[in-house]
């Protein structure tokens, strides 16, 4: 299982880790920087002598992660420079602490940095939680980073991407890879954010499920191996392995019904019945002969037969599809219902 968190959820888990679990913020920042350093070393340690890293650091804790990363890379023998973007007087306390420490390491920090001399660009401007369009010198910095030809790495979330929705807020850093901290952010898997994030690595920085304190993220995905199918009874038969009823496929959309039926069988259903337009009968019976067939007129009498009901794939937006939806949701079978986008369209048309 992979959790997909919002900015608000991530901030709460970060706070819980610090205040309730007793892991200090600077420790979390150091671990974030170590995770980013590990990623860079995996890619570039073999060519360290030819690798020059430029980090664009904002004034928040994401920028602090960038400063800590600069220190670690410099200590490991990399050529590193930091370009600060923003008003240092408004920097966070952790940022200021990292900045003071960085002065003892061979890291270039002056304003006259030739960006095109560097072949690894690190975005540490904003991180998670950006909610306003990127403007002014921040937008200039993003555009400057995007114009370089080097490898581009984002820390936590590419600057300019809404971490909740994946929307581009004005302009955004186009990364080759993103190292995100703690849990994956929704905006890294939703487009267009996923395209801007590139390869995504979720790093363990010490913020784990213990930080939920009873409030788990609302969204997650199943990974390979997360779903374990039940072991089938050797003495069972197709009637004991579950019955799936599919309301799918308007006239001319029989393919959607066939694909849905095949998916039901592949995920373990013993019997599958397809309720579809009468014009699709021959195509479906040829395409998946093991499935049962029923017309829309037979829907009501089929509801009690099913253990699970799916409605939506390819049913279109005609009156007949709407009547099928009403038949299902007005019955006791609605508790066994899964749906698709078309289902949501009809629900909205009924309610609004």
Name each model feature, range by range:
Residues 89-90, 128, 317-318:
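Short, small-residue-enriched loops and turns at beta-alpha junctions
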Residues 1-81, 188-337, 343-352:
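Small-residue (G/A/S/T)-rich helix-start motifs and N-terminal tracts that mark the onset
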Residues 96-99, 168-170, 282, 287-291:
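Short low-complexity, flexible loop/linker segments enriched in glycine and/or proline
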Residues 38-125, 133-155:
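Nucleotide and nucleotide-moiety/phosphate-recognizing core
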